[in-house]
């Protein structure tokens, strides 16, 4: 899967309606959010085998064990090229403290809570904790 030439426009269109959407396991959690971003940029859903398979935290763990590679990082390693988090670029997938988001250079965007507001949150790069990153490749 490769980014489309207009991937930035596609990503912005994907993010806009999600800004205030609350977290929901299996529908709008960190995995489905990051996968939706990849699909917006590339036109390919990287996790079709997970869609509709879980609706709880426990269910997500079961899905990772049954159709994934056992855990989130290993599942992503099998689907994307891992890169050092210090080299993550805009549009790449980043994990910080087990939370997946989309890199926007100096920060990542993820599903979460900021005070009383639920929806998309910003996590500055300096605050990334034990980060991992995966490249969403550019087109051929």
Positions of the model-derived regions?
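...with weaker cross-activation on analogous glycine-rich loops/strands in unrelated enzymes
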Residues: 57-123
């Amino acid at each position: 899967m490769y980014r489309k030439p207009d991937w930035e426009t596609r990503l912005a269109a994907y993010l806009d309606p999600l800004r205030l959407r609350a977290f929901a396991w299996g529908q709008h959690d960190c995995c489905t959010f990051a996968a939706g971003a990849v699909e917006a940029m590339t036109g390919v859903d990287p996790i079709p085998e997970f869609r509709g398979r879980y609706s709880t935290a426990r269910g997500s763990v079961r899905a990772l064990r049954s159709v994934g590679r056992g855990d989130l990082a290993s599942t992503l390693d099998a689907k994307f090229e891992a890169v050092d988090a210090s080299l993550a670029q805009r549009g790449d997938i980043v994990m910080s403290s087990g939370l997946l988001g989309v890199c926007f250079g100096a920060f990542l965007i993820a599903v979460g809570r900021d005070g009383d507001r639920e929806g998309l949150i910003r996590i500055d790069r300096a605050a990334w904790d034990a980060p991992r990153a995966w490249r969403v490749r550019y087109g051929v």
